[in-house]
Amino acid sequence: MFNGFDQGDFLSKSSDDWISRLELNFVLQEGCSVLKKISHIGPILVQKIFYPENDKSNIPHVYLLQPSGGLVGGDQIHISVCLESGSKVLLTTPGSTKFYRTNGKYILQEHIFKLKDNTSLEWLPQSSIFFPNTKVKINTIFHLEPGARIIIGEILCFGSDGWLDNYGSPDVIDIFLRICLPYCSGLRDRLKIDSQNYIDKLHGFKISASLFAAPSNKETLKVVRSLITSTVDIQIGGVTLIDELLVVRLLSNNNQRIKELLYHIWSVIRPIIIGQEAVMPRVWFT
């Protein structure tokens, strides 16, 4: 069941709706992080596991495959990922996730990540694309134990090329994020957009991106701030430090530029946060 969602969101299901569940458990074996256990129901699954980095790190790049046809009202995705002590993983998707117009029912997504001591997770899915008249609820929670490290990136696109004034608007997009850190308050973040307020909430922009990283410090803050201020085509960008959590916000109408900047920030801070030089997932270039 989705934490923070009403029970009514799960009612009125039909045979056309599908529920997909994926559970992943990573462990450290002989100095290498491996996928020890996998359980899945429905069309979401692990497409591929790569080890493109040097032998010293052995950080797997794991691609999560979601339905290429996109999601419609009544569909549900539940993803649970656990990193056992000392393990590391980079998770991404081979393509964007598309949320289409609904029949009055919500599309529901739940992501739960548990990072045990001295682990590292990079959660870097490709863009989420929200089409007009969609109803979406997304709940994502990260639990970090002492010594855990994390980088989270997300890009939200409203329409395939962003909404046009006469193109339409969402019914509801409700996105909740919680990052639980071991020694500080962490973050509770919510973005709720509907047909009445989406222009104001996004300040007229069509693409929103965020990046979160921990543990961070003031030096990392300065580095990222300089990257944002020196980038053109990003109309609004900001970065702040909440205890040990770095928070980056970007708004633009240029999908390619905002993606390039987000990936550039990741590549610069990865050695600081994760302790490894950046190796871009191959799927980002296909």
UniProtKB/Swiss-Prot annotation:
The keyword Aminoacyl-tRNA synthetase does not apply. It comes from the Bacteria. InterPro entries: UreD. It is found in: Cytoplasm. The keyword Metal-binding does not apply. PANTHER family: UREASE ACCESSORY PROTEIN D (PTHR33643:SF1). Required for maturation of urease via the functional incorporation of the urease nickel metallocenter. This is Urease accessory protein UreD. It comes from Blochmanniella floridana. The gene is ureD.
